[in-house]
Amino acid sequence: MTDLAIIWTNGRGDIAQDGIDMLTDDSLTTDVTISLFTDRRALDSDTLPDGSDDRRGWWGDSYRDRPIGSRLWLLSREKATPDTLERARGYAEEALEWLKTAGRVSAINVRAEQLHQGWLYLYIALTLPDGSVIPYEFKAAFNGV
């Protein structure tokens, strides 16, 4: 499926352009970026980072079997502890699982690290059905995940 191409630069997603034209993309890159960095609705059991009752999410998920996005935003006020990094890894895997269910990939491998103070690094390897592997690296500020 072709979507607007999303690029990840300086810790933020943006629509890819060529001059004044918006570019399209049918690779996994846009799917992965949207899956990771769109706010998925928090579960009732999740603790919300700002203490509000705003569980975020996309209203269209009310009509879908599979919600869009990830719960990485729940980590926005967390300190980078081993537990937080494990949650980040789990949230990323959860967000990307639909690629496996849809047959777009056969395996998903996610690693979460903090290499610099206040930054979350996600290393993702997606194995395609033909066995080839596509690597992705994302960097996001913990105060803006």
UniProtKB/Swiss-Prot annotation:
Q: What GO cellular component entries does it have?
A: host cell cytoplasm; virus tail, baseplate
A Pfam family: GP46
Could you tell me where this protein is found in the cell? Answer: Virion; Host cytoplasm
Matches recorded under InterPro entries: Phage_Mu_Gp46
The main location class comes to: virion
How far does the signal peptide extend, from start to end residue? none
Q: What happens when the gene is disrupted?
A: No tail is synthesized.
- BP GO terms, sorted: viral tail assembly
The record's keywords, sorted A to Z, are: Host cytoplasm, Late protein, Viral baseplate protein, Viral release from host cell, Viral tail assembly, Viral tail protein, Virion
- Induction per the UniProt record: Expressed in the late phase of the viral replicative cycle. Expression of late genes is activated by the viral late transcription activator C.
Function in brief = Component of the baseplate. Probable connector between the central and peripheral parts of the baseplate. Probably involved in tail assembly.
Q: How does it assemble?
A: Part of a complex composed of three DNA circularization protein N, three baseplate hub protein gp44 and three sub-complex wedge (made of two copies of each baseplate protein gp46, gp47 and gp48) that forms the baseplate.
List the protein's name: Baseplate protein gp46
- Its source organism is Escherichia phage Mu (Bacteriophage Mu)
